[in-house]
Protein backbone atom coordinates (compact mmCIF):
# COMPACT_ATOMS: atom_id res chain seq x y z
CA UNK A 1 0.00 0.00 0.00
CA UNK A 2 1.97 2.96 -1.24
CA UNK A 3 5.63 3.55 -0.46
CA UNK A 4 7.71 4.86 2.44
CA UNK A 5 6.44 8.40 1.77
CA UNK A 6 2.96 7.13 2.76
CA UNK A 7 4.26 6.12 6.20
CA UNK A 8 6.84 3.65 7.46
CA UNK A 9 8.71 2.57 10.58
CA UNK A 10 12.06 0.89 10.03
CA UNK A 11 14.42 -0.47 12.69
CA UNK A 12 17.48 -2.31 11.40
CA UNK A 13 21.24 -2.67 11.75
CA UNK A 14 23.15 0.12 10.02
CA UNK A 15 25.38 -2.49 8.39
CA UNK A 16 24.30 -4.89 5.66
CA UNK A 17 22.01 -7.63 6.97
CA UNK A 18 23.49 -11.06 6.26
CA UNK A 19 20.68 -13.13 7.76
CA UNK A 20 17.10 -12.54 8.89
CA UNK A 21 14.89 -14.97 10.83
CA UNK A 22 11.32 -14.37 12.02
CA UNK A 23 9.08 -16.27 14.36
CA UNK A 24 6.14 -15.75 16.67
CA UNK A 25 6.72 -16.59 20.30
CA UNK A 26 4.84 -19.77 21.15
CA UNK A 27 1.10 -19.25 21.57
CA UNK A 28 1.34 -15.44 21.21
CA UNK A 29 1.10 -12.66 18.66
CA UNK A 30 4.57 -11.39 19.61
CA UNK A 31 6.84 -11.30 16.56
CA UNK A 32 10.59 -11.77 16.99
CA UNK A 33 12.96 -10.93 14.14
CA UNK A 34 16.67 -11.74 14.45
CA UNK A 35 18.91 -9.72 12.16
CA UNK A 36 22.56 -10.66 11.73
CA UNK A 37 25.28 -8.43 10.34
CA UNK A 38 29.07 -8.34 10.42
CA UNK A 39 29.18 -6.77 13.91
CA UNK A 40 26.66 -9.04 15.61
CA UNK A 41 23.00 -9.95 16.03
CA UNK A 42 19.98 -7.92 17.17
CA UNK A 43 16.47 -9.13 17.92
CA UNK A 44 13.43 -6.95 17.22
CA UNK A 45 10.42 -7.76 19.39
CA UNK A 46 7.18 -6.34 17.94
CA UNK A 47 3.69 -6.49 19.43
CA UNK A 48 0.49 -4.63 20.23
CA UNK A 49 -0.60 -4.89 23.87
CA UNK A 50 -4.28 -5.80 24.24
CA UNK A 51 -5.52 -2.64 25.94
CA UNK A 52 -8.60 -0.81 24.82
CA UNK A 53 -8.20 2.87 25.61
CA UNK A 54 -5.18 3.79 23.48
CA UNK A 55 -3.65 1.41 20.94
CA UNK A 56 0.12 0.95 21.13
CA UNK A 57 2.72 -0.56 18.86
CA UNK A 58 5.69 -1.65 20.96
CA UNK A 59 9.08 -2.42 19.48
CA UNK A 60 12.05 -3.53 21.57
CA UNK A 61 15.55 -3.76 20.10
CA UNK A 62 17.57 -6.38 21.96
CA UNK A 63 21.31 -6.94 21.59
CA UNK A 64 21.96 -10.68 21.17
CA UNK A 65 25.61 -10.79 20.13
CA UNK A 66 28.37 -8.20 19.60
CA UNK A 67 27.82 -4.44 19.44
CA UNK A 68 25.56 -3.46 16.56
CA UNK A 69 24.89 0.05 15.24
CA UNK A 70 21.15 0.41 14.63
CA UNK A 71 19.22 2.97 12.63
CA UNK A 72 15.60 3.90 13.08
CA UNK A 73 13.49 5.79 10.55
CA UNK A 74 9.88 6.77 11.20
CA UNK A 75 7.67 8.47 8.62
CA UNK A 76 4.37 9.29 10.31
CA UNK A 77 1.49 9.83 7.92
CA UNK A 78 -2.24 9.98 8.57
CA UNK A 79 -5.30 9.55 6.32
CA UNK A 80 -3.86 6.66 4.30
CA UNK A 81 -0.53 8.39 3.85
CA UNK A 82 -1.84 11.71 2.56
CA UNK A 83 -1.29 13.92 5.64
CA UNK A 84 2.09 14.82 7.11
CA UNK A 85 1.60 15.66 10.81
CA UNK A 86 2.95 18.51 12.87
CA UNK A 87 5.77 16.98 14.98
CA UNK A 88 7.37 18.27 18.20
CA UNK A 89 10.05 16.84 20.40
CA UNK A 90 9.03 15.95 23.91
CA UNK A 91 10.93 14.60 26.88
CA UNK A 92 12.01 11.07 25.86
CA UNK A 93 10.09 11.06 22.62
CA UNK A 94 8.03 13.02 20.15
CA UNK A 95 4.45 14.10 19.57
CA UNK A 96 2.79 14.08 16.13
CA UNK A 97 -0.61 15.69 15.50
CA UNK A 98 -2.77 15.88 12.37
CA UNK A 99 -6.41 16.90 12.77
CA UNK A 100 -8.19 14.50 15.14
CA UNK A 101 -5.23 12.12 15.43
CA UNK A 102 -2.18 12.20 17.68
CA UNK A 103 0.75 9.84 18.16
CA UNK A 104 3.33 9.82 20.90
CA UNK A 105 6.60 7.94 20.42
CA UNK A 106 8.28 7.20 23.74
CA UNK A 107 11.92 6.08 23.69
CA UNK A 108 15.16 6.83 25.54
CA UNK A 109 16.94 7.18 22.16
CA UNK A 110 17.67 10.69 20.87
CA UNK A 111 15.40 11.44 17.91
CA UNK A 112 16.17 13.87 15.08
CA UNK A 113 13.90 15.31 12.40
CA UNK A 114 15.24 15.03 8.86
CA UNK A 115 13.30 15.72 5.63
CA UNK A 116 9.86 15.06 7.16
CA UNK A 117 11.09 11.85 8.81
CA UNK A 118 12.20 11.07 12.34
CA UNK A 119 15.52 9.25 12.54
CA UNK A 120 17.84 7.88 15.20
CA UNK A 121 21.21 6.17 15.31
CA UNK A 122 22.23 4.14 18.35
CA UNK A 123 24.12 1.01 19.36
CA UNK A 124 23.06 -2.11 21.21
CA UNK A 125 25.36 -4.63 22.82
CA UNK A 126 24.61 -8.11 24.08
CA UNK A 127 21.95 -7.87 26.79
CA UNK A 128 20.84 -4.29 25.97
CA UNK A 129 17.13 -3.67 25.39
CA UNK A 130 15.97 -0.40 23.86
CA UNK A 131 12.20 0.24 23.84
CA UNK A 132 10.07 2.22 21.39
CA UNK A 133 6.36 2.67 22.20
CA UNK A 134 4.11 4.37 19.64
CA UNK A 135 0.70 5.31 21.06
CA UNK A 136 -2.32 6.72 19.21
CA UNK A 137 -4.93 8.89 20.92
CA UNK A 138 -7.49 11.57 19.98
CA UNK A 139 -5.66 14.90 19.60
CA UNK A 140 -8.30 16.79 21.59
CA UNK A 141 -7.51 14.75 24.71
CA UNK A 142 -4.45 14.61 26.93
CA UNK A 143 -1.96 11.85 26.13
CA UNK A 144 -2.71 8.54 27.87
CA UNK A 145 -0.46 7.18 30.56
CA UNK A 146 2.75 5.90 29.02
CA UNK A 147 3.12 2.18 28.48
CA UNK A 148 6.10 0.43 30.03
CA UNK A 149 7.45 -1.74 27.19
CA UNK A 150 8.80 -4.57 29.35
CA UNK A 151 5.66 -4.78 31.48
CA UNK A 152 3.51 -4.68 28.34
CA UNK A 153 5.56 -7.53 26.85
CA UNK A 154 4.92 -9.74 29.89
CA UNK A 155 1.23 -8.81 30.00
CA UNK A 156 0.80 -9.44 26.26
CA UNK A 157 2.46 -12.86 26.43
CA UNK A 158 0.28 -13.78 29.43
CA UNK A 159 -2.87 -12.56 27.67
CA UNK A 160 -2.29 -14.71 24.58
CA UNK A 161 -1.13 -17.79 26.47
CA UNK A 162 -4.17 -17.61 28.72
CA UNK A 163 -6.45 -17.05 25.73
CA UNK A 164 -5.21 -20.16 23.86
CA UNK A 165 -5.86 -22.40 26.87
CA UNK A 166 -9.46 -22.55 25.63
CA UNK A 167 -8.21 -24.54 22.63
CA UNK A 168 -8.63 -28.15 23.77
CA UNK A 169 -7.10 -29.69 20.64
CA UNK A 170 -3.90 -31.60 21.42
CA UNK A 171 -3.31 -33.39 18.11
CA UNK A 172 -0.53 -32.92 15.62
CA UNK A 173 -2.17 -29.86 14.06
CA UNK A 174 -2.43 -27.93 17.33
CA UNK A 175 0.32 -25.43 16.43
CA UNK A 176 -1.17 -24.28 13.08
CA UNK A 177 -4.66 -24.34 14.61
CA UNK A 178 -3.57 -22.07 17.48
CA UNK A 179 -1.74 -19.75 15.05
CA UNK A 180 -4.94 -19.48 12.96
CA UNK A 181 -7.07 -18.82 16.04
CA UNK A 182 -4.69 -16.09 17.25
CA UNK A 183 -4.71 -14.47 13.80
CA UNK A 184 -8.51 -14.47 13.67
CA UNK A 185 -8.75 -13.08 17.21
CA UNK A 186 -6.36 -10.26 16.28
CA UNK A 187 -8.59 -9.17 13.40
Language model features with spans:
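Acidic, mature catalytic/reactive cores of soluble proteins
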Residues: 1-187
Amino acid sequence: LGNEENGRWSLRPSDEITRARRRYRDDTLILETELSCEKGVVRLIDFMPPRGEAPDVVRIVEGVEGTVPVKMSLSIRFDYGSIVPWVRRRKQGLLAIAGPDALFLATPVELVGRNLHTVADFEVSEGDRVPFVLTWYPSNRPPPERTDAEEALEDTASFWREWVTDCAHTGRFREPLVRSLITLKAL
